Amino acid sequence: MCRLYAIILIVLVMNVIMTIIPDSKVEVVSCEDCPEHCSTQKARAKCDNDKCVCEPI
């Protein structure tokens, strides 16, 4: 039973860490905002399945 509580505690801590430190590469940007978003990264805007993809110039 103690192991079960330890596993649950570890999972909860990992969830909190992932919430606090999100993956910086994953940014959901709509196609309308894509050109502005990619211009800040000096990249070319491209929409792929309604997701913004910035291609290096």
Swiss-Prot record:
Cystine residue pairs: C31-C47, C34-C52, C38-C54
Annotated InterPro entries: Scorpion_toxin-like_sf (IPR036574), Toxin_alpha-KTx_8/9 (IPR008911)
Tissue: Expressed by the venom gland.
Cellular compartment(s): Secreted
BP-aspect Gene Ontology terms: envenomation resulting in negative regulation of voltage-gated potassium channel activity in another organism
The UniProt record lists the keyword Metal-binding: no
Prosequence residues removed at maturation: 20-28
PTM annotation: Contains 3 disulfide bonds.
Keywords assigned: Disulfide bond, Ion channel impairing toxin, Potassium channel impairing toxin, Secreted, Signal, Toxin, Voltage-gated potassium channel impairing toxin
Function: Selectively inhibits voltage-gated potassium channels rKv1.2/KCNA2 (IC(50)=331 nM) and hKv1.3/KCNA3 (IC(50)=503 nM). Partially inihibts rKv1.6/KCNA6 (IC(50)=9983 nM).
More details: Negative results: does not affect the following channels: rKv1.1/KCNA1, rKv1.4/KCNA4, rKv1.5/KCNA5, Shaker IR (with inactivation domain removed), rKv2.1/KCNB1, hKv3.1/KCNC1, rKv4.2/KCND2 and hKv11.1/KCNH2/ERG1.
Name the record gives this protein: Potassium channel toxin alpha-KTx 8.8
Organism expressing this protein natively: Orthochirus scrobiculosus
Taxonomic lineage of the native organism: Eukaryota, Metazoa, Ecdysozoa, Arthropoda, Chelicerata
